[in-house]
Each structure stands twice: as C-alpha cells, then as structure tokens.
A protein has these predicted regions:
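Active-site cofactor/substrate anionic-group-binding motifs, chiefly glycine-
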Residues: 42-43, 47-95
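Anion-binding alpha/beta catalytic cores of soluble intermediary-metabolism enzymes, centered on
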Residues: 35, 97-168, 259
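Positively charged, low-complexity intrinsically disordered leader regions
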Residues: 1-56, 60
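Short, structured coil segments at secondary-structure junctions
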Residues: 65, 95, 115-116, 172, ...
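Glycine-rich phosphate/diphosphate-binding loop of Rossmann-like nucleotide-binding domains
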Residues: 48-60, 142-219
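Adenosine-phosphate binding glycine-rich loop
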Residues: 254-255, 261-306
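Rossmann-like adenosine-cofactor binding region
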Residues: 195-271
Length: 306
C-alpha cells in the first residue's frame, strides 16, 4: 500500500490490516511500549482546509512514531499562487518522506500521488474522508468485536463522510443504510460501487426507514466547509434528518452513536443524545490518532519493521 487516496482503492484485507495495526499501536501507547517505526522521517501536512483534529492527531502521531511533522498552509505553498501541482509534488518529494493533504478537490490529492514519488495520505477532500472512517470502523469493532451481522446507518447530507462510510462499511461486511433528502445523495461513483453489494445497501429519504434495526447511527454537520452561504437553507432542508431520541428508538437497543465532530447540537444531533453517547463519540475522536498512525506506518515504514 503506497498511498491512502480513497477507500475505494483498498481491498477488504488492506482495511482490516490497517485496523489490526491501529489496535496494536493503541495497545502499545496505552502500555508505554515505544514504537518509533518512522524514526527520522518527516511528514508534510498541507492544509487548504483547516482542522483541529486532523492537525493535532497527525502531528502527535508522527511524534509518537519517532518522526517529525511539518505544517504547510496555503500561504506557505506556491501552489496557492499558481504553481502546477505536479511541480509542487516533485519538489516536496525531494524534501519529505510523506505528504498528508486536507483540501477541497480529490483531483489535487490524486495528482500529488501521480507526480510525486513519496506516499500521499488523504486527510479530507470534498469527495471522501478515509482517515475518519477508518477511525469509525476501529471504534465500531472495539464495541461489537466484529462487523458480522451489523447494520450501520448514516443520517444527513450525502457528503464526503457518507461516501467513505458507505465504501468502508460495505467492504468490511456490514449492512449500510443512508438517509438523505432528495438532491443530496452520495456521489454517483459511490452509488455505482454499491451495486455490487445488492441488498446490503439501502438509500432512503425517510430517516426512520434507514435507522430501523440499526446497530450504529452516524451523522455529520448539515453544512460542510465551503457551503456556509447555504447554511440557513440547509437547516430547513435537513430539519427532519436529526439523531434524536425518537430516531434512536427505531434502531436496535444499545445502538452506538458516532459523530466525526465538530457537532452542532440541536441541529444534526440533539444535546441529550450527544451527551448520552459522548464516550462513544470521543473514543471515535481518539481513534483518529491510532488509525492515522497505522496509515502512516502502512505507507511510510518498511514492512519488515511491523
């Protein structure tokens, strides 16, 4: 595995391998067992979209793995002033050992990998959020022990989170249901992918239909970065797509609730449900650290070292 560009590129075995490695790294961290698997290496972190969790978890993770993380904003790169991405990729490949990029267009991530000669990790694009979903899958498996027989349900906008959850959930063997309003479906390429999974995938407009019998309920903000001008209109469109006590009652007893954060209480999730499931949600947030460390090791370390 040379890069993590999108979960569509990974096999089931590769996903499970990353989750197993993340579990191992989490155990070692909790027991003060050092694992400097990237000693002396430098990860360049390109942020064209800001983020608390992505920066802190990658920077901390790289430190714990014995390496160094270098923060690069749009202001630090000539790419923001018109330099072709292929030139940026080739220059950074001479200085760094890996690149993590959080940006708008998936094409930028793909081109960094195409023209560069070092591993590239997708920290988020408008199309997908693979690192977050690997953390989600890790958290789900911690609670339930395996993915067998589970139903995962996403409620809200058919955005990058929905796209990656669909792909990741189906690839590890879960049933996946998604509820979105008309006009806000997941990406067409992802819906095409689901055709190979038959009735293991369901796309609904009724959130209660999607949530029925679910073991995991997941949501995300109604308004993603770059959509701020649509905020008030989206509040009206998504008002019925909220994880609340009524929707939770449609799921299986003891259902897990996840949210990638930041959460807007009273919109996509109620304050009451958020606080009742806060331990699950913040375990999910912690697991970003461990899952991303596993990704960095998988693409940057020598296989013999782990």
């Amino acid at each position: 595995m040379k890069n993590l560009l999108k979960l569509l590129d990974l096999s089931t075995e590769e996903i499970i391998g990353i989750l197993d490695l993340a579990d191992q790294l989490k155990y070692e961290r909790k027991h003060n067992i050092p694992h400097e698997l990237l000693k002396g290496q430098t990860l360049g972190m390109i942020f064209q979209k800001s983020s608390t969790r992505t920066r802190v978890s990658f920077e901390t993770g790289m430190y714990q793995l014995g390496g160094h993380a270098l923060f690069l904003s749009s202001r630090d790169l000539q790419i923001g002033r018109g330099e072709p991405v292929q030139d940026t990729a080739r220059v950074l490949s001479r200085y760094l050992d890996g690149i993590m990029i959080r940006t708008f267009e998936q094409k930028e991530v793909e081109n960094l990998a195409k023209f560069g000669s070092i591993p590239v990790i997708n920290g988020l694009t408008d199309f997908c959020h693979p690192c977050q979903v690997l953390a989600d899958l890790m958290t789900i498996r911690e609670k339930f022990g395996s993915f067998s027989g589970l139903k995962m349900c996403f409620i809200g906008d058919g955005n990058n989170m929905a796209n990656s959850l669909i792909v990741g959930g189906l690839k590890v063997g879960m049933n996946v249901a998604v509820a979105t309003p008309d006009g806000y479906k997941p990406d067409g390429a992802v819906l095409e992918f689901t055709k190979g999974y038959g009735d293991k995938f369901a796309l609904e407009t009724d959130p209660f239909m999607a949530a029925s019998g679910a073991d995991i309920l997941i949501t995300d903000t109604w308004t993603s970065m770059g959509e701020e001008a649509e905020k008030e209109e989206r509040k009206k469109i998504f008002k019925d797509y909220q994880i609340n006590r009524q929707l939770l009652a449609a799921a299986n007893a003891g259902a897990m609730v996840q949210h990638c954060l930041p959460a807007y209480r009273g919109q996509e999730i109620t304050e009451e449900v958020f606080e009742e499931h806060a331990d699950e949600i913040f375990n999910e947030a912690e697991n970003r650290l461990h899952a991303q460390k596993a990704v960095m090791v998988a693409v940057m370390a020598d296989k013999k070292d782990w």
